[in-house]
């Protein structure tokens, strides 16, 4: 706006035009703009406009320039902008540039009606911009909501992934624990098997020792029986030995026989003398025959005794062999019985071991079946949980999609409502303005009262009535959407009437403000012309 950066240079450049500025400017006309630019506070404005010491307009302008000079470069720029808006010719003289804002020129050229038309056009443009910005804002809100929905979906998926990771970690920990337990059980089973094998080996050794002791006991019993038999034989032999009386009788018979033999020998010696006698010869022959027979009988007896002794020896040997064979047979029978009992015990143990093995295998198969069934049930439950999680995620996704569609529908509904408002405003712009000019005098007093109350609010936020009207229209449309009893023509007519009332009131307020400013400008212009002529 200015070519000067230093405050002193800015205001020193305006000192040459101070007399012209004081003579032309009306402080009541530019103070609202200066206050809007925040270079003039309400106290300064009250001092400039309402101070009883400042009755003359030129003194008011001088005080205003002094106040603005204290604000520095910002006050200088705001003052030049106010000159550009309200005093374009003076701005051209001071800066040597053409003003870019031509509000006062429009007032001078086309009058108040042209200014009103221009203001209405600008208001409509601003309203259209507000509508576009509102639509853009709604679309951005919808996009933000969609992003929030996507963010919630992403968070849901992240939570699900985290939950799956936690489940995987828990499953891996449980699998590791099961493996450790299985390893411990296998180790315990191996130790128990080793202990069982050691116990079986000790049992077998003890059984062998018992069998050996039993065999030794049986041998001792057999030896005892053999000794008992020998003892019985000796006792029987002692019992069969001849008695002492029989021995004495046999001894007497032997003595008698010896005496007779001696007598016979004596008689034989005596009979040698009478050998030649026939009687003696006969006796000798008889004696020889008897002796020969006796010798034959003795040899026969001797042979028979020899045979008897041999038979008795053979009989004794056979009896001994028989007894030995009987003892061997008894020992073999006992050994066979022992081995039979041992085999039966081993077979019984094998049957018991096989029964225990079958029971262990059956219990192991049952445990495996139970474990497999539990794993299947666990897998089924996990599958059901996973399916339920997927269903929940799908339902939540459908809920989010429904919410996004609902938000999109609301955005489209808002856009349609804004389009309807734009269409109604276009229809109002195309309608003849003479009806408005005819209806202006009728509502002038009422609108003047309303304008006096709401002029400050209109200056601060010119878009607020349109927003309120838009909110009313949205509320009406939301109220009328569920109830389809009212026709759309009636709703459009109501909207058109409310918008016409708003435009009428807005135009009246603008016209009153422009009339007041025009009267002040006219008086100031005449006064400035008089002062210029006087100064010239």
From Swiss-Prot:
Any one GO BP annotation for this protein: defense response to virus
Cross-link (Glycyl lysine isopeptide (Lys-Gly) (interchain with G-Cter in ubiquitin)): 125
Domain CARD: 6-98
One cellular component term from this protein's GO annotations in UniProt: protein-containing complex
Modifications the protein undergoes after translation, according to the UniProt entry: Phosphorylated at Thr-231 by PRKCD downstream of C-type lectin receptors activation: phosphorylation promotes interaction with BCL10, followed by activation of NF-kappa-B and MAP kinase p38 pathways. Phosphorylated at Thr-531 and Thr-533 by CK2 following interaction with VHL, leading to inhibit the ability to activate NF-kappa-B.
Major location (coarse): cytoplasm
Record keywords: Adaptive immunity, Coiled coil, Cytoplasm, Immunity, Innate immunity, Isopeptide bond, Metal-binding, Phosphoprotein, Ubl conjugation, Zinc
Binding site for Zn(2+): 3, 10, 73
Regions annotated as coiled coil: 117-277, 303-420
Stretch list, region Disordered: 425-451, 472-536
InterPro entries: CARD, CARD_CARD9, DEATH-like_dom_sf
Effect ascribed to mutating residue 526 to A: Abolished phosphorylation by CK2 and increased activation of NF-kappa-B
Modified residues annotated as Phosphothreonine in this record: 231, 531, 533
Subcellular localization, as worded in the UniProt entry: Cytoplasm
Pfam families tied to this protein: CARD
Molecular function (Gene Ontology), one example: signaling adaptor activity
Stretches for region Linker: 99-116
Outcome reported for the amino acid change (mutating residue 533 to A): Abolished phosphorylation by CK2 and increased activation of NF-kappa-B
UniProt cross-references to Gene3D superfamilies, sorted A to Z: Death Domain, Fas (1.10.533.10)
Biased segments, Basic and acidic residues type: 487-502
Domain characteristics, as noted in the entry: The linker region, also named autoinhibitory interface, is required to prevent constitutive activation and maintain CARD9 in an autoinhibitory state. Disruption of this region triggers polymerization and activation, leading to formation of BCL10-nucleating filaments.
Quaternary organization: Monomer. Homodimer; homodimerization is mediated by the CARD domain which forms an extensive interaction with the adjacent linker and coiled-coil regions; leads to an autoinhibited state. Homomultimer; polymerizes following activation, forming a nucleating helical template that seeds BCL10-filament formation via a CARD-CARD interaction. Interacts (via CARD domain) with BCL10 (via CARD domain); interaction takes place following CARD9 activation and polymerization, leading to the formation of a filamentous CBM complex assembly.
PANTHER family with a match to the protein in the record: CASPASE RECRUITMENT DOMAIN FAMILY, CASPASE RECRUITMENT DOMAIN-CONTAINING PROTEIN 9
Biological role stated in the UniProt entry: Adapter protein that plays a key role in innate immune response against fungi by forming signaling complexes downstream of C-type lectin receptors. CARD9-mediated signals are essential for antifungal immunity against a subset of fungi from the phylum Ascomycota. Transduces signals in myeloid cells downstream of C-type lectin receptors CLEC7A (dectin-1), CLEC6A (dectin-2) and CLEC4E (Mincle), which detect pathogen-associated molecular pattern metabolites (PAMPs), such as fungal carbohydrates, and trigger CARD9 activation.
Official protein name in the record: Caspase recruitment domain-containing protein 9
Organism this protein belongs to: Rattus norvegicus
Lineage, highest ranks first: Eukaryota, Metazoa, Chordata, Craniata, Vertebrata
């Amino acid at each position: 706006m200015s070519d000067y950066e230093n405050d002193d240079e800015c205001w020193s450049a305006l000192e040459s035009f101070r007399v012209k500025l004081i003579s032309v400017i009306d402080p009541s006309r530019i103070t609202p703009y200066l206050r809007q630019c925040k270079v003039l506070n309400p106290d300064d404005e009250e001092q400039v406009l309402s101070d009883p010491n400042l009755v003359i307009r030129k003194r008011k302008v001088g005080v205003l320039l002094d106040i603005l000079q204290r604000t520095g470069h910002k006050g200088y720029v705001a003052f030049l902008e106010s000159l550009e808006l309200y005093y374009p010719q003076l701005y051209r003289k001071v800066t040597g540039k053409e003003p870019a804002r031509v509000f006062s020129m429009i007032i001078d050229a086309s009058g108040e009606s042209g200014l009103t038309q221009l203001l209405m056009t600008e208001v409509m443009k601003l309203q259209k911009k507000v509508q576009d910005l509102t639509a853009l804002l709604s679309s951005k809100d919808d996009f933000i909501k969609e992003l929030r929905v996507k963010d919630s979906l992403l968070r849901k998926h992240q939570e699900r992934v985290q939950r799956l990771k936690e489940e995987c970690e828990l499953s891996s920990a449980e699998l590791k624990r099961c493996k450790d337990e299985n390893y411990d059980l296998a180790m315990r089973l191996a130790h128990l098997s080793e202990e069982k094998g050691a116990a079986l080996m000790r049992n077998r050794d003890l059984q062998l020792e018992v069998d050996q002791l039993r065999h030794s006991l049986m041998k001792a019993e057999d030896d005892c029986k053999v000794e008992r038999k020998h003892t019985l034989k000796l006792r029987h032999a002692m019992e069969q030995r001849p008695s002492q009386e029989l021995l004495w009788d046999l001894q007497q018979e032997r003595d008698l026989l010896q005496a007779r033999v001696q007598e016979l020998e004596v008689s034989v010696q005596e009979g040698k003398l009478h050998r030649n006698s026939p009687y003696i010869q006969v006796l000798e022959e008889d004696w020889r025959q008897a002796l020969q027979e006796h010798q034959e009988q003795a040899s026969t007896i001797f042979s028979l005794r020899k045979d008897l002794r041999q038979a008795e020896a053979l009989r004794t040997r056979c009896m001994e062999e028989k007894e030995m064979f009987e003892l061997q047979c008894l020992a073999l029978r006992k050994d066979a019985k022992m081995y039979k009992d041992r085999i039966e015990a081993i077979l019984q143990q094998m049957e018991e071991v096989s029964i225990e093995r079958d029971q262990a295998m059956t219990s192991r198969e049952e445990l495996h079946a139970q474990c497999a069934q539990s794993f299947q049930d666990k897998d089924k439950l996990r599958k059901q949980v996973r399916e339920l999680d997927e269903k929940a995620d799908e339902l939540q996704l459908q809920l989010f999609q429904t919410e996004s569609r609902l938000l999109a529908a609301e955005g489209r509904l808002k856009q349609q409502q804004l389009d309807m408002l734009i269409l109604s405003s276009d229809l109002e712009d195309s309608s003849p303005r003479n009806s408005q000019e005819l209806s202006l005098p009728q509502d002038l007093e009422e609108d003047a009262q309303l304008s006096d109350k709401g002029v400050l609010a209109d200056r601060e936020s010119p878009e607020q009535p349109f927003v309120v009207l838009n909110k009313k229209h949205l509320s009406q449309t939301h109220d009328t959407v569920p109830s389809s009893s009212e026709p759309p023509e009636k709703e459009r007519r109501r909207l058109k009437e409310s918008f016409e009332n708003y435009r009428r009131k807005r135009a009246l307020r603008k016209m009153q403000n422009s009339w007041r400013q025009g009267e002040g400008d006219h008086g100031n212009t005449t006064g400035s012309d008089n002062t210029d002529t006087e100064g010239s």
